[in-house]
Curated annotation (Swiss-Prot):
Compartments, record wording: Cell inner membrane; Cytoplasm
Catalytic activity: ATP + H2O + cellular proteinSide 1 = ADP + phosphate + cellular proteinSide 2
Binding site for ATP: Q89, G107, E108, G109, K110, T111, D502
GO CC terms, sorted: cell envelope Sec protein transport complex; cytosol; plasma membrane
Residue sites binding Zn(2+) per the record: C888, C890, C899, H900
One Gene Ontology term from the biological process aspect of the record: protein import
Signal peptide range in chain numbering: none
Organism: Roseobacter denitrificans (strain ATCC 33942 / OCh 114)
EC class: translocase
Protein name as it appears in the record: Protein translocase subunit SecA
SMART domains tied to this protein: SecA_DEAD (SM00957), SecA_PP_bind (SM00958)
UniProt keyword annotation of Protein transport present: yes
Keywords: ATP-binding, Cell inner membrane, Cell membrane, Cytoplasm, Membrane, Metal-binding, Nucleotide-binding, Protein transport, Translocase, Translocation, Transport, Zinc
Recorded name of the encoding gene: secA
Length: 904
């Protein structure tokens, strides 16, 4: 019997059906315009672009321009690439332009789809960012689709790491910019450490199209981008602690694989105290619970996590004396990305490689908050519907399933569940042999490098030629994936999310065409494609006769989305294909979430060695377990976002003020307001309201005025005067400081004074914000314990972080006021030297952002990749970026502000 919801959908259609239906008249308009645009010359296509630009500037909406613009873009793509966009690709582009996520199945041509929405929105001249998951795809797509944009008269750029700054600024100034999500986020942070407007990369955040949007906005949502600087070296502590961990017994800790957490038991804590005392890490009489034990306990906890939660060749690999993390969703290496809070150092100690110093945060942002900066955001992926609720709640993005150009002919078989992993792999080997014997290409999906290499060894012993795609073969990725659809091909891949290259039966025609065009840019794209397709036809026919691509997965992932991405590699563009999952009760997901019930079923059925249970309810049971995991992860991301939103509001205020300062011509009003506010604070502190004169702290006020305001006025005499009140003293201080600064401006010259004010303000903001970030990190790490006292940690964090922010602003005002009061007239050379010194200190911080060394919470962090440079008192770039109250890097023992950081 049909449910009410099912009957309703049959009568009225689903919301998705209605959205698709609404675009059909627009697609019909575009198709009707096609003959008109086919008649245009190459120059005529560019002239149309100029016409559209003019109409947009005159107020015509992009929606009104869409049919003509899409028709123009379709014709340009046909001429430049030999590709005529399908109606379904145009439909996907409409959804992108409307600010949705377009779910297009693998092989439906997302790369070309994006060009239409990018072209239309690029007509405004405000820039469009097309976001990819790796630099290879960014460069490939920019070169490939750049020919289309070029034919239309738009400029295309690609921003990637390690490129010259001038070239990167030019790339961002293009109409269309391709870049990875990491590079965009880091460049945003770098921009907010710059001191001159002409150094800025990202002028505005107009429209972003995010490819593999689920990978970037869901899987990496908990990953903060962090620009960091070096802190003190604790490598010996990590080595000492690492020697302790192997002595820990199983009853000394509790491991929760569901939450990926490990903690010491009471027995473990007792054992720790004993062994740490023996190692000299705890002093006689010192307990683990003493405040002074915090650091060593933190190191021990991270050491335990490194040994019990992180596995070599699954979570990371060791390459060239470095621990390189592996993306659990894509299987790619993530060079330069480091775990935070000393966890990466603990893994380095575990593996016996060089231990790099921990880093301190200079600037950070999450992908969630970075991509919410854009005026309009859209995305593409083959799998988004399972996360539709999160996309809408977090980003305000709707998900629309775009119809396939041809019906899907792939057969998705029920899961086969074996009792042991050995039985499962033996069954998989037989399946691979069977398919390979008839020439059917096989794509074998695994979840770790270790398992992919184990399967590879089994195939070698069986004499089956094959390719392996995992983090170790990262560089050959595109070619391995492109060849996976060839006759008789066997490919083992560790996760297929965001691979970017299409698996086409018989081989990837698009990649061959692109390679040929790169080798001969003057070749006719349509003729070249026709020639390659003719050669490819026989190969494809053989593969079709063998049954198409067979996807064989060795495990289910925690996310249904990742499983669907693997399945979706087969059956592209209506091709035949097959997919199946071979599982065992020893698999991680089965073991953690559902093996007990299945174990009973298997025993009841009395399955023999090598037999498997195959039934639809097994699939449903696993999908329910996956759904629970997805829901839990969504809740974690929501909670983390609530905390990050607190910092994000403060970040927007600071970065906004910073940009205003950089754009301002005259900052004297701002610095005057700061100075007056400092005076108000002094009056309130030392001459409290509603108090008598004999209760005032005149000596404290006098000392503060001398130190902070740089004036020597008879405060002690003023307070003795008959009838004088706090307001009168305030006015005298304001008058005296205003007079002082007016004199300084006259002595320096107005232009020099404005430059000094700007540089001092920017330096103070950067220093105070960096210190504030560190304070917030510490607060965030301990605020969770407030829950034990029946206090909401989030509210506690909000309240205390606001108070800390207010305190930071007070400190900022005092710092700027004090520095401005201390400057004295200099020669022109001295003035320039001081400005250059301040800029050099800022440049040192920016230099930390230039290299790809980074990390936090498994997040990317940009930081210094080289060893510390020796201090040179004549070269400020070697000074690092110490805070005003930190020790001077010259090792004089003085505070930086009293030594080389002195501004006099």
């Amino acid at each position: 019997m049909l449910g009410i919801g099912t009957i309703s959908r049959k009568i009225f259609g689903s919301p998705n059906d209605r959205k698709v239906k609404a675009t059909r008249p627009v697609i019909a308009q575009i198709n009707a315009l096609e003959p008109e645009f086919e008649k245009l010359s190459d120059e005529g296509l560019k002239e149309k672009t100029e016409e559209f630009r003019k109409r947009a500037l005159e107020g015509e909406s992009l929606d009104a321009l869409l049919p003509e613009a899409f028709a123009n873009c379709r014709e340009a793509a046909r001429r430049a690439l030999g590709l005529r966009a399908f109606d379904t690709q145009l439909m996907g582009a409409v959804f992108l332009h409307q600010g949705n996520i377009a779910e297009q199945k693998t092989g439906e041509g997302k790369t070309l789809t994006a060009t239409f929405a990018a072209y239309l929105n690029g007509l405004t001249g405000r820039g469009v960012h097309i976001v990819t998951v790796n630099e290879y795809l960014a460069k490939r797509d920019a070169a490939w689709m750049g020919s289309v944009f070029g034919a239309l008269g738009l400029t295309t750029g690609v921003a990637y790491s390690d490129m010259p700054e001038d070239e990167k600024r030019k790339a961002y100034a293009s109409d269309i910019t391709y870049a990875t999500n990491n590079e965009l986020g880091f460049d945003y942070l770098r921009d907010n450490m710059k001191s001159e407007l002409d150094q800025i990369y990202q002028k505005q955040h107009n429209f972003a199209i995010v490819d593999e949007v689920d990978s970037i906005l869901i899987d990496e949502a908990r990953t903060p981008l962090i620009i960091s600087g070096p802190s003190q070296d604790r490598s010996e502590m990590y080595k000492t602690v690492d020697a302790v961990i192997p002595q820990v017994r199983d009853d000394h800790f509790e491991l929760d694989e569901k939450t990926r957490n490990v903690t010491f038991t009471d027995e473990g804590n007792e054992f720790l105290e004993e062994i740490l005392h023996a190692q000299g890490l705890l002093e006689e009489g010192q307990s683990l619970y003493d405040p002074e034990s915090t650091t060593v306990v933190h190191h021990v906890n991270q050491g335990l996590r490194a040994h019990k939660l992180f596995q070599r060749d699954k979570d990371y690999i060791v390459r060239d004396d470095n621990v390189v993390l592996i993306d659990e969703f894509t299987g790619r290496m993530m060079p330069g990305r480091r775990l935070s809070d000393g966890l990466h150092q603990a893994i380095e100690a575990k593996e016996g490689v060089d231990i790099k110093p921990e880093n301190i945060t200079l600037a950070s942002v999450t992908f969630q908050n970075y991509f919410r900066l854009y005026d309009k955001l859209s995305g593409m992926t083959g799998t988004a519907l399972t996360e539709a609720e999160e996309f809408m709640e977090i980003y305000g993005l709707g998900v629309v399933e775009v119809p396939t150009n041809k019906p899907i002919a792939r057969v998705d078989e029920d899961d086969q569940v074996y009792r042991t992993a050995r039985e499962k792999y033996e069954a998989m080997l037989e399946k691979i042999k069977e398919s390979n014997a008839k020439g059917q290409p096989v794509l074998v999906g695994t979840t770790s490098i270790e398992k992919s290499e184990m399967l590879s060894n089994m195939l070698k012993q069986a004499g089956i030629t094959h390719n392996v795609l995992n983090a170790r073969q990262h560089e050959q990725e595109a070619q391995i994936v492109a060849d996976a659809g060839k006759y008789g091909a066997v490919t083992i891949a560790t996760n297929m999310a965001g691979r970017g290259t299409d698996i086409q039966l018989g081989g990837n025609v698009d990649l061959q065409v692109m390679n040929a065009l790169t080798a001969d840019p003057d070749a006719d794209p349509e003729a070249l494609r026709a020639s390659i397709e003719a050669q490819h036809a026989d190969e494809k026919a053989k593969v079709l006769a063998a049954g198409g691509l067979y996807v064989l997965a060795s495990e289910r992932h925690e996310s249904r989305r990742i499983d669907n991405q693997l399945r979706g590699r087969s059956g592209r563009q209506g091709d035949p294909g097959r997919s199946s999952f071979f599982l065992s009760l020893e698999d991680d997901l089965m073991r953690i979430f559902g093996s007990e019930r299945l174990e009973k079923v298997l025993k009841t059925l009395g399955l023999k060695e090598g037999e498997a249970i195959v039934h639809p309810w097994v699939n449903k049971s696993l999908e329910r377990a996956q759904s629970k995991v997805e829901g839990r992860n969504f809740d974690i991301r929501k909670q983390l976002l609530k905390f990050d939103d607190v910092m994000n509001e403060q970040r927007k205020v600071i970065f906004g003020q910073r940009r205003e300062i950089m754009e301002a011509k005259d900052l004297s009003e701002i610095t005057t307001d700061m100075r007056h506010q400092v005076i108000d604070d002094f009056i309130e502190q030392y001459l409290p309201p509603n108090t008598y004169a004999d209760q005032w702290d005149a000596e404290g006020l006098y000392a503060a005025v001398q130190e902070q305001l740089g004036i020597d006025v008879p405060v002690m005499d003023w307070v003795e005067e008959e009838g004088v009140d706090d307001e009168a003293i305030r006015e005298r201080l304001v008058e005296a400081t205003d007079k002082l600064m007016t004199e300084k401006a006259g002595q320096f010259g107005a232009e020099n004074m404005r430059n000094i004010e700007k540089q001092l303000l920017l330096q103070a903001i950067d220093t105070k914000w960096r210190e504030h970030l560190l304070t917030l990190e510490h607060l965030r790490s301990v605020v969770g314990f407030r829950g034990y006292a029946q206090r909401d940690p989030l509210n506690e964090y909000k309240n205390e972080s606001f108070q800390l922010f207010e305190s930071m602003l007070d400190s900022l005002r005092e710092d700027v006021t004090q520095k401005l009061s201390q400057i004295r007239p200099m020669t022109e050379e001295e003035q320039q030297a001081m400005i250059e010194q301040i800029r050099a200190q800022q440049a040192a911080a920016q230099a930390a952002a230039a290299g790809p060394t980074v990390s936090a919470q498994a997040g990317p962090v940009a930081g210094p990749a080289d060893a510390a440079v020796a201090f040179d008192e004549n070269d400020p770039s070697t000074w690092g970026n110490p805070g005003r109250n930190e020790p001077c890097p010259c090792q004089s023992g003085k505070k930086f502000k009293h030594c080389h950081g002195r501004l006099i």
